[in-house]
């Protein structure tokens, strides 16, 4: 970066032109590359605003993002870094060899982090490290999480220790941030990942692609 030129010519692209390839976590086998077009970033914006209870580019900017999620992953890049920059919101960068709950509490407190995406595994480690002790100087405004169900105990811990409700959301690398909670406009319930993010239609279907009007215990699929 020190030797990079500060002048460049922007290449003209279409919204449908390929922008980048992000690899999945390999849920059903090895990681697979998901080719995302340039329009993907703008398509992500509503899905970021909902769990973070709406963002603003108005001055003065009061929000401040940080996440332990790697920026090479869809969660770090498209759930935090690029959307925050879209709004002109600063993002804290911190390099660590592995997730450390003590360092995380210290960083969020000292730097006055306002917004964070914390994967469920990170939240569970933080709860194990500090199950009940009040943490001083936390100024969090929003916490988003997704990847697996958090459970009632973890959600209640978030309210008591982090000082905010944790907004759970759902998405995949190739179709991210499609369903979400938003404590600012709807009650959050244990076991619920919220409602469809504006711009998406979400349906529960069976193996034959038929709509299930009243999902029960039978095998069903999320269709977006």
Give the residues covered by each predicted segment:
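Short Gly/Pro-enriched turn/cap motifs at secondary-structure boundaries
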Residues: 10-13, 191-197
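Conserved small/polar residues in nucleotide/adenosyl-binding loops
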Residues: 24, 222-224
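Gly/Ser/Thr-rich phosphate-binding loop
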Residues: 86, 113-118, 127-188, 201
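Conserved beta-loop-beta connector loops within the AMP-binding
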Residues: 203-222
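Structural detector for helix-capping/boundary residues
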Residues: 1-4, 16, 39, 111, ...
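Conserved AMP-binding/adenylation subdomain of ANL enzymes
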Residues: 42-114, 128-129
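Conserved pre-ATP/AMP-binding loop-to-beta segment of ANL
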Residues: 3-23, 30, 55-64
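Conserved S/T- and glycine-rich ATP-binding loop of Class I adenylate-forming
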Residues: 18, 24-27, 65, 108, ...
